[in-house]
Amino acid sequence: MTEKTPRKPASFTVSQASNRPEAADEAPRRPRAVRDLDVVVAQPDVFALSEEEAAELEILDPSFEAPERKGWSLSRILFGALGILVSFAIGIWTEDLIRALFSRADWLGWTALGVAIIALAAFIAIVVRELVALRRLASVQHLRKDAADAAERDDMAAARKAVDALRSIAAGLPETARGRQLLDGLTDDIIDGRNLIQLAETEILRPLDREARTLILNASKRVSIVTAISPRALVDIGYVIFESARLIRRLSQLYGGRPGTLGFLKLARRVIAHLAVTGTLAMGDSVIQQLVGHGLASRLSAKLGEGVVNGLMTARIGIAAMDVVRPFPFNAEKRPGIGDFIGDLVKINGERPDKKHPGK
């Protein structure tokens, strides 16, 4: 076979005719309707909120921290003095009772003394348990502030300290096992303080936040249904108070607070103070019309509207309790709002007209 000689390099001239200027002279196609496609007409949602109504709902969201009162107030001094006097009165009455029983019979006196010692031991145990619960709640509040400060300053050492405290609080919660295991593997890694706080919030608190949303929604649904079927307003108020108190306690237990009786009272006071900072607690007919607009209020009957109002109030109390008992502030995760629950509450208390009467 003979080898072919390579072609010598040469130059070529590009013709300007390739631009096809005649394409620009073509007339545009006339618009015409397409009739062979199925046209789907969107049906408006009668319970959908407008942007203005949703913005008004978000105003109710308690996203501010209630200021803590420091020092001794007159009410604390009064109740403290009364408590000391009552303790002295109980002690003197117990002593007189034991002396009187000893004067009657020795075995009665010794029995009364033993019962008094048992009662005193049980009282001391209750006081210690309440103090431990109060200390646990205080540690959660301090951890919340430390985490916010570490994330703001991007301090890695402070962030690791806050994350370690969060892991110790969540050690007994099975929902956080996977997140704690992930953070255990990052002990020797170099991570920025803000990113470490966000990672701990995502991996540890996200399952708890999901469960907290479920608790708030279920409590709001129960309040809404009971309000809609109860014959007396007093029953509505009593059930709202009962359900709100149970919701506050369950949310605190969910995040590892486990409050006692005194701890629950202090926690409830913080939640009420938290709500007082962000607005009024009571929501009447005029307030709910300002919140969700006159359109939604006119779509529901009076009793069903009251159910939605009480359900929203319960949801707002739950969100405020979530803000108070959550160890870390909302940073990486989205904070729940009133608008996240109103759709479910409305669906419970009323059906859409097209679903209720499909033939009309």
Swiss-Prot record:
The family this protein is said to belong to: Belongs to the UPF0283 family.
Keyword terms of this UniProt record: Cell inner membrane, Cell membrane, Membrane, Transmembrane, Transmembrane helix
GO cellular component labels: plasma membrane
Subcellular location field: Cell inner membrane
Main location: membrane
Membrane topology: Multi-pass membrane protein
Full protein name: UPF0283 membrane protein Oant_2119
NCBIfam families cross-referenced by the UniProt entry: hyp_HI0043 (TIGR01620)
Keyword Membrane annotated: yes
Residue stretches spanning the membrane: 77-97, 108-128
Region (Disordered): 1-30
